[in-house]
Structures are given as C-alpha cells and as structure tokens.
C-alpha cells in the first residue's frame, strides 16, 4: 500500500479535511495507520473534536481500541477536551472507558481534572471506575479537588467516590483542600464524611495542611 496515501489520510483527519479523507479511504488508505508515535487518524480527529471525521472513520471499521506509544486511546483525547458526542460514539463503538495510559491515567481522570462535568457524568454512567488510581495514587476525585472543579467533585461524591482515598504520599482530598486554603471546599468535604484524623506518610493530619484560612470554627472542626 502507498505510504503516501496513509500519511495524507492522517493529515486530513488531523485538519478536518473531510473530502480528502473520504478520497484517501476510497483509494485504499489504511484507516488504522499509525505515525511514528503510534497515533492514529481516530486519535487525531477525536482530540480535536472533528465529529464528521470520526463518523467517517467509524463507518470504515476503524479500531477504536488502538493505543499510541504512551498507551493513550482516542477516547482519552476526546474526554480530556470535553467532546461529549465523540465520547458517546467511541464508547458505543467499543472503547474501553477504564483503559489507562502508561502513567495509569484514565479518560475519567483527564475529564475530571479539566472540569468536563458532562463527560465525567457520561463515563461514570457507562462504567468508568471512579476509584482507579494512577501511578501517583490519584483518583479522579483527587484530581478534581486539586483543580477546584466543584461540579465534578459534587457529582463524583454523589455517585459514591471514596472521599478518603489516599495517594502515594498518603494525602486525602481533605488534606489537598486544606493545603489550597479553600474553606468552602473543606466544609463540603467534611459534610461528605471526609476523615479529618487520617494521617499521611509523614504523620500529618488535615489540620497540619491548613493554609491561608482564618476561620477558627473550621480549625476546631479539623482538630
């Protein structure tokens, strides 16, 4: 097969050139062609939100489970950038909602970190495991707390995410919130049964993480 056609198809899918992509496929270009980094046409189109290109590739039996050198999938790219319709199409076509990259990062973690609430909701409703951890021991909820994504935090906790999960340093969501100095978030986590008495790997409690909060009532709650 002509490698030039494959590369032209990849370029077309990367730049939303639907007519060129159709032409290359009709001429026999490989919809599953990978570049030197292992990235595919579907990965490129999905992370850029090119829904028509994604539809074209799906119609031509593209592999939705393909991985690049980092073990990223097309779904991870779409989830990270909040492209809900593309996420739907990929999951319906067989994408694994719990697939993780070489760092243990899942589609849910990526969406949670960037506050893509609708994508988070869709993934959880379709089987995404909220308590999976990455190589640093972080869950999607810990990511959301670190990034102050309040809507995501509320949703994940309402769905039963473990508020007391500890990362590799022994830190919990409450400790991270205390370190950020976000009093509203600290109160909310305490209301959702965050354990103030958990200690990290260095023996510190949430109270010892507290910064930039002049709230005696809160300090008493954390004691």
Report the location of each language-model feature.
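Intrinsically disordered, low-complexity regulatory segments in ankyrin-centric signaling systems
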Residues: 1-27, 36-39
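Ankyrin-repeat-protein effector appendages
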Residues: 1-8, 126, 159, 191-195, ...
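Ankyrin repeat structural motif
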Residues: 17-25, 50-58, 83-91, 116-124, ...
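Ankyrin repeat A-helix N-terminal signature
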Residues: 11-16, 44-50, 77-83, 110-116, ...
């Amino acid at each position: 097969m002509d490698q030039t056609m494959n590369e032209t198809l990849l370029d077309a899918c990367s730049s939303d050139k639907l007519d060129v992509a159709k032409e290359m496929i009709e001429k026999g270009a490989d919809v599953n062609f990978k570049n030197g980094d292992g990235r595919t046409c579907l990965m490129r189109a999905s992370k850029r939100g090119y829904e028509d290109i994604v539809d074209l590739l799906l119609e031509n039996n593209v592999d939705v489970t393909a991985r690049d050198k980092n073990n990223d999938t097309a779904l991870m790219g779409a989830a990270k950038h909040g492209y809900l319709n593309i996420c739907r199409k990929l999951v319906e076509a067989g994408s694994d909602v719990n697939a993780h990259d070489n760092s243990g990062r899942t589609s849910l973690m990526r969406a949670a970190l960037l506050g893509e609430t609708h994508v988070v909701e869709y993934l959880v409703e379709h089987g995404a495991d909220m308590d999976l951890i990455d190589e640093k021991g972080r869950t999607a909820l810990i990511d959301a707390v670190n990034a102050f994504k309040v809507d995501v935090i509320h949703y994940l906790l309402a769905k039963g995410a473990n508020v007391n999960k500890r990362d590799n340093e022994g830190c919990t969501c409450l400790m991270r919130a205390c370190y950020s100095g976000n009093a509203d978030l600290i109160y909310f986590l305490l209301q959702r049964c965050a354990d103030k008495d958990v200690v990290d790997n260095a023996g510190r409690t949430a109270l010892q993480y507290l910064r930039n909060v002049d709230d005696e009532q809160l300090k008493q709650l954390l004691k």
